[in-house]
């Protein structure tokens, strides 16, 4: 599936002038296929650069003047493709980007980004070692990590920038527990390691609950102030940051020195629907089939036609990120109308009932998620039918399908 994404997304700019492109995988093939290969795409994503820009601008309008924005581009920009979106990030003057993997960091740097690059999860020593040339600011939450990175810094002859993670937000995955004397001692030891330069202190909140955030924010402020005093860190040299998309917008006092928006930029923040999704998931009709009443459809014969029916075969299945559980529940859009998925979704095929839809022909566009004419398939609809949260869907889409970037 990566092969498919590489071929199509590399060639789209040469054949469709209204699109710009970036390859879906981070390690891409430079060979350009012919136009016929583009037409062989069974499913694809359309990413709206205009909506991405609009979401960024709207988000920026709610930030304090002195609050820096660090755009979180982990999971290859939430499945939307780092390489395709970085030109917009740069044009918008975003000073910081957050990533998870070295491949993502390299894609950011190769886009021409010269700003601050932060890893937003704990990394192994081998990851950190192989990323020294990328100038990543690492997230440190244990004494051992600090020792390992300090030794790496010494060997490389560099002073490495780090952000200390505290567990005051209650996430329990990266940070130091500051409620114990042992935890406080560990934090001071990290902050005073030679060859490491502490440039930030952070935490992360696990819930969409403003009152809970405010209570934990107070604890973070107390912990970070204590740590800076004990480790002789200068306040003006430390970036304090705790706010993800939800917190930045709904608890403005938590914006502090920097915010870390992720989902909101891509249109995935359930509490703030005023930020539309930038992605659509599409396929096309591959064939039409006329079945008589009482015909069964799909594996396990879970659907039986109640009338003479016209069924459309769609060349997309769970291997492309359209889950098996969509069967007999979900709907898709064809000719601006809803068509019910019948039978369970197969690995590479989905069947929909188009008996009541006029003018359906092979090759016509089908919207699996997104809008078509006056109809739309919403996030909540996808989640309910798939029995998955939306990020589990779109991150899989991004690894399984070519991306077309629409102005």
Swiss-Prot record:
Its cofactor is pyridoxal 5'-phosphate. SMART domains: Ala_racemase_C. It is found in: Periplasm. Its EC number is 5.1.1.10. Pfam families: Ala_racemase_C (PF00842), Ala_racemase_N (PF01168). The active site is at 74 (proton acceptor), 299 (proton acceptor). It is an enzyme of class 5 (isomerase). The substrate range of BsrV, which includes activity towards non-natural substrates (e.g. ornithine, norleucine, homoserine, N-acetyl lysine methyl ester, diaminobutyrate and aminobutyrate), is broader than any other known amino-acid racemase and suggests that it has great potential for biotechnological and industrial applications. Currently, production of DAA is an expensive process that is typically reliant upon inefficient chemical catalysts. The modification N6-(pyridoxal phosphate)lysine is found at residue 74. Disruption phenotype: Cells lacking this gene have normal growth and morphology but produce minimal D-Met, D-Leu, D-Val, and D-Ile. They contain twice the amount of peptidoglycan (PG) of wild-type cells in stationary phase, whereas PG levels do not differ in exponential phase. Addition of physiological amounts of D-Met and D-Leu to cultures with a deletion in bsrV reduce the amount of PG to wild-type levels, which confirms that the absence of D-amino acids accounts for the increased PG in the bsrV mutant. Disulfide bonds join 70-96. Changing residue 167 to A: Completely abolishes or highly reduces the catalytic activity towards all the amino acids. Residues 1-23 form the signal peptide. Changing residue 119 to A: Highly reduces the catalytic activity towards Ala and Ser and completely abolishes activity towards Met, Leu, Asn, Gln, Lys and Arg. Keywords: Disulfide bond, Isomerase, Periplasm, Pyridoxal phosphate, Signal. One of its GO terms (biological process) is D-alanine biosynthetic process. Belongs to the alanine racemase family. Bsr subfamily. Amino-acid racemase able to utilize a broad range of substrates. Reversibly racemizes ten of the 19 natural chiral amino acids known, including both non-beta-branched aliphatic amino acids (Ala, Leu, Met, Ser, Cys, Gln and Asn) and positively charged amino acids (His, Lys and Arg). Among these substrates, is the most efficient with lysine and arginine. Is also able to catalyze the racemization of several amino acids that are not typically incorporated into proteins such as ornithine and norleucine. HAMAP family: Bsr_racemase. This is Broad specificity amino-acid racemase.
């Amino acid at each position: 599936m990566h092969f498919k994404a590489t071929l199509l997304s590399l060639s789209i700019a040469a054949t469709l002038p209204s699109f710009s492109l970036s390859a879906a995988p981070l390690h891409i093939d430079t060979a350009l296929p012919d136009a016929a290969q583009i037409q062989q795409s069974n499913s694809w994503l359309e990413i709206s650069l205009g909506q991405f820009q609009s979401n960024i601008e709207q988000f920026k309008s709610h930030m304090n003047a002195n609050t820096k924005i660090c755009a979180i581009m982990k999971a290859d920009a939430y499945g939307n493709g780092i390489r395709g979106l970085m030109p917009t990030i740069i044009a918008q003057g975003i000073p910081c980007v957050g990533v998870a993997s070295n491949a993502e960091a390299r894609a950011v740097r190769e886009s021409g980004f010269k700003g601050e690059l932060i890893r937003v999860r704990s990394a192994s020593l081998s990851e950190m070692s192989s990323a020294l040339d990328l100038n990543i600011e690492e997230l440190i939450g244990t004494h051992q990590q600090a020792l390992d990175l300090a030794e790496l810094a010494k060997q490389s002859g560099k002073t490495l920038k780090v952000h200390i993670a505290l567990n005051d937000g209650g996430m329990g995955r990266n940070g130091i527990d500051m409620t114990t004397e042992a935890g406080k001692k560990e934090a001071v030891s990290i902050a005073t390691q030679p060859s490491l330069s502490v440039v930030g202190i952070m935490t992360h909140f696990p819930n969409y609950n403003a009152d809970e955030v405010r209570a934990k924010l107070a604890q973070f402020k107390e912990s970070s102030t204590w740590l800076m005093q004990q480790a002789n860190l200068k306040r003006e040299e430390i970036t304090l940051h705790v706010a993800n998309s939800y917190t930045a917008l709904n608890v403005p006092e938590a914006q502090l020195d920097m915010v870390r928006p992720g989902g909101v930029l891509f249109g995935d923040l359930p509490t703030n629907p005023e930020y539309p999704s930038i992605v659509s998931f599409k396929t096309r009709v591959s064939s039409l089939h006329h079945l008589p009443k009482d015909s069964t459809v799909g594996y396990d014969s879970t659907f039986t036609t109640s009338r003479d029916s016209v069924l459309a075969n769609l060349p997309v299945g769970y291997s492309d990120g359209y889950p098996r559980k969509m069967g007999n529940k979900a709907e898709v859009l064809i000719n601006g109308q809803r068509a019910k998925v019948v039978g369970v979704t197969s690995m590479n095929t989905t069947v929909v009932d188009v008996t009541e839809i006029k003018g359906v022909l092979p090759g016509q566009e089908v919207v699996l998620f997104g809008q078509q004419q006056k109809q739309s398939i919403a996030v909540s609809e996808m989640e309910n039918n798939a029995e998955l949260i939306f990020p589990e869907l779109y991150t899989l889409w991004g690894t399984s399908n070519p991306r077309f970037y629409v102005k």
